[in-house]
Amino acid sequence: MPHEATRRLEFDAGHRVPEHGGKCRTPHGHRYAVDVTVRGPLGREGFVLDFGEIKAKLGAWIDEHLDHTTIYQRGDSLMEAMAALNRAAKLKPYYAMDAAPTAEALAELIFGVAQRLLDAEVVRVNVHETPNCSAAWAP
């Protein structure tokens, strides 16, 4: 049975779920925690994958694209107007997704990025919006 290892990465971001009937329709923010689980045989150092490599590769992508920005659904007119103001002020760009930026959609997005960047089998990504609420993506 292969080993699994999980690394937690954290970031702060705003988002809005435009079709939500409740408070998530209003732009707001979270302190996200992302648990990335990889599986495989132990390498010569005794790791599936060095936790530092996960942080260096996937953490750097998260820092560049998601941390301290606003994540929105492409076509959301309110958020696209806010993103244009953000660009005009030369601030960090907003991050546009094809789907509503829910924890579920972020888990799928980050899973795909992790698969491209990490030198191990990615088996699951779990995104925590709050300490009590999370969503996972696994193939």
Regions found by a protein language model. Give the residues of each.
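Charge-rich, low-complexity N-terminal segments
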Residues: 1-139
